[in-house]
Amino acid sequence: MKLRTCCISLMLLLALPLQAARIKDVSEVAGVRSNQLVGYGLVVGLPGTGETTPFTDQSFNAMLQNFGIQLPAGTKPKTKNVAAVAVNATLPAFTKQGQKIDITVSSIGSAKSLRGGTLLQTFLKGLDGKVYAVAQGSLVVGGFSVTGADGSKLVGNIPTVGRISNGAMVEQEVPNPFGRGDFLTFNLFESDFSTAQRLADAVNEFLGPEMAAAIDATSVRVRAPRDVSQRVAFLATVENIEFDPAVGAAKIIVNSRTGTIVIGQNVKLKPAAITHGGMTVSIKENYQVSQPAPFSGGETVVVPNSEIEVTEKDSRMFKFEPGVTLDELVRAVNQVGAAPSDLMAILQALKQAGAIEGQLIII
């Protein structure tokens, strides 16, 4: 009953008419983007939960050499309080030199836990190989790992991943094309020719004719002032213009792993009749002991005895007339007591029969 209520409520919610949206809610300015940074470093100060992998030892020796410490030849350091880690961060657009960003630290070796560790100075590089930030600091780890003397182990959450809030300082800014050219381009999050044209029409209605033009299903180009300060004020105005996005294409999204089914607003069915029955095959393997008669010279053996039981649920047939909506489809399927897996099978069969007006996407 709860499943039926949730499905019907979700369908009704999706069927509500679209509301006006601000431009910044459905699009982003081209060139105004974040960048990914990554680096390799060492976490020290671990309470014996580190590692002794070859690359960790090599990195540890290189660090000592940078500090002017040369180990005797053949010396193998014990690095159970050290772990090799990968450090990654996201550099937001317009982040300035000297500002700080959050980082995530992940073990890449056999360390059991990073709890209590400190990340040493680590260079964070971009795709071009340049250093844009430097990370360092004490980790905050949500998980834990405990090992007993008898080898028993208890692990909670993920102890090999930690975060450092404001753990990296930006040393170099990323060039941004925001202040260049005569136009600003807005890229829709969901490509749609109708929505792109409506966005351009809304800007032209607000600012004047020929100020905006839809380039394709994703991009809308808007004429903007060259002066940077005026451009900021101009963008602040444009991104708050409201318009009515177009209704998207009719789609049914099915997640075969979780059983989640999302049906879009415009999905309809052509005339069709459906019957769906469930068959269950149960195989039970029993073992019996065959005991020979006394003094017969036979051997005691174990003989398998299989029991196979087949049960089939009563199937019902229901018919859809032209123009049936998604709500009626869900109600009809729920009335026959179908589970989400049954609904997925029905939807796939309807699509193969050409009875669904829309896309069926299985993820």
Curated annotation (Swiss-Prot):
Signal peptide: 1-20
Pfam families reported for this sequence: FlgI
Places the protein is found: Periplasm; Bacterial flagellum basal body
MF (Gene Ontology): structural molecule activity
Any one GO BP annotation for this protein: bacterial-type flagellum-dependent cell motility
GO annotation, cellular component aspect: bacterial-type flagellum basal body, distal rod, P ring; outer membrane-bounded periplasmic space
Function, in words: Assembles around the rod to form the L-ring and probably protects the motor/basal body from shearing forces during rotation.
PANTHER family: FLAGELLAR P-RING PERIPLASMIC PROTEIN FLGI, FLAGELLAR P-RING PROTEIN
Family: Belongs to the FlgI family.
UniProt protein name: Flagellar P-ring protein 2
Gene source species: Photobacterium profundum (strain SS9)
